[in-house]
Design a protein with these regions (language model features):
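Stable alpha-helical elements in mature extracytoplasmic
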Residues: 5-9, 47-54, 94, 98-105, ...
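Conserved SGNH/GDSL esterase-like catalytic core that processes O-acyl groups on lipids
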Residues: 1-49
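A recurrent domain-boundary module in secreted/ectodomain proteins
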Residues: 170-188
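A short, hydrophobic C-terminal helix/tail in secreted or cell-surface proteins
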Residues: 191-208
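Active-site His/acidic residue clusters
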Residues: 32-46, 71-87
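Short, charged juxtamembrane terminal tails flanking transmembrane helices
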Residues: 210-213
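Mobile gating loops/cap/lid regions near enzyme active sites that modulate substrate access
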Residues: 73-97, 104, 108, 114-171
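Structural recognition of the beta-strand scaffold that forms the well-ordered cores
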Residues: 25-31, 35-37, 59, 65-70, ...
Length: 213
């Protein structure tokens, strides 16, 4: 399995840079998706605290600039939809719960650590993307383009028009949706962005397939 975000930062990234984070980098810290996917509210107990610890560790190492996306509505993913109304409702509830805890936590970190934190509202982004799908060239907002097992190298079939889908598989976005999200994230970074020339992605969209924290 993939290493947790905590392991990625404390066991991989920081040792690789001698424990000194780049103060001019923009650190993207994104997690929680797999915790929500469990459907178990108890799993969320440590989700946001772990993200707080990750940001605190990076800040202690010298990082000053962070982009912290929240979670999309996991209830909108093909995986959740296939589970039926109860699974959808549970995933939506946990997504909202996690996001509420996260926004409160980042507000506290700004004050306690004195760092720059940009909150990226991916929940709103996905809702808006689906609502405006036609104008964006998207024709399928609920299905999965790839029909095989989630993961790398698994057997399966691919749809003929992946750029018209929001979801690649049961949980991950397509390249087209990734591009839209990238533009959205870029627009959230204040000018002058030139001050943050290097982006260090502690977790990108793949966060949904990794353990959250």
């Amino acid at each position: 399995s993939s290493p947790s975000l905590t392991a990625q930062v404390g066991g991989m990234y920081l040792p690789s840079v001698g424990g000194v984070a780049d103060p001019n980098a923009l650190y993207v810290v994104w997690g929680g998706g797999n915790d929500v996917r469990t459907g178990d509210p108890a799993v969320l107990t440590n989700s946001v605290p772990n993200i707080v610890n990750i940001i605190s560790a990076l800040a202690a190492a010298g990082a000053t600039n962070f982009l912290v996306p929240n979670l999309p509505n996991i209830g909108l993913t093909p995986e959740a939809q296939a589970g039926g109304p109860a699974v959808v409702a549970g995933a939506t509830f946990l997504s909202v719960t996690f996001n509420g805890q996260l926004i409160a936590a980042t507000a506290g970190l700004r004050s306690s650590l004195g760092v720059n934190i940009i909150d990226l509202d991916v929940y709103a982004f996905l809702n808006t993307t689906i609502a405006n799908a036609g104008a964006l060239g998207i024709t399928n907002t609920t299905g999965r383009c790839y029909s095989g097992t989630t993961g790398i190298g698994g057997p399966g079939t691919v749809c003929a028009n992946p750029n018209e889908y929001v979801f690649w598989d049961g949980i991950h976005p397509t390249a087209a949706a990734h591009a839209l999200l990238g533009n959205y994230a870029s627009s959230a970074i204040p000018v002058p962005a030139a001050a943050w020339l290097f982006v260090s992605g502690i977790a990108a969209l793949g966060a949904l397939r990794r353990k959250a924290a």
